[in-house]
A protein has these predicted regions:
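Nucleotidyltransferase catalytic core that binds NTPs
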Residues: 1-131
Length: 131
């Protein structure tokens, strides 16, 4: 079984996220999503609209996702790749090169982002339409 792992906050899940998850799953048989915890988001000075538990529930309902695990810090990736026996590490190409150190442990793939969509844009648009 080929295992794929990806990381993210996945707040206000949108079709760009779904596209990434679909393409990541297509690279293997089992997709693991490491989801940024609320505490880790605070360290990154990010505030999610949905809590970790809510975002986890949403991701678990996605047919492409097999397992959701918490992402608690920047340094857990090597341990996660080993623990979950990941064959492929996937991120959006906005992270190109940032995780090449994982090539000693698994294949690293940077997928092109879906054009014209981002969580930041979606949140800004939602604020505009609800004024």
């Amino acid at each position: 079984m080929k295992r794929v792992i990806t990381y993210g906050t996945f707040d206000v899940l949108h079709y760009g996220h779904i596209n990434l998850l679909k393409r990541a799953k297509a690279l293997g048989d089992y997709l693991i999503v490491a989801l940024s915890s609320d505490e880790f988001n605070a360290i990154k000075n990010k505030k999610s609209y949905y809590t970790y538990e809510q975002r986890k529930m949403i991701l678990e309902a996605c047919r492409y996702v097999d397992l959701v695990i918490p992402e608690n810090d920047w340094d857990q990736k090597i341990d996660d790749v080993k623990k979950y026996q990941a064959d492929i590490f996937v991120m959006g190409d906005d992270w190109e090169g940032k995780f090449d150190f994982l090539k000693d442990y698994c294949e690293v793939v940077y997928l092109p982002r879906t054009p014209d969509v981002s969580s930041t844009q979606t949140k800004a648009h939602l604020q505009e339409v609800t004024k």
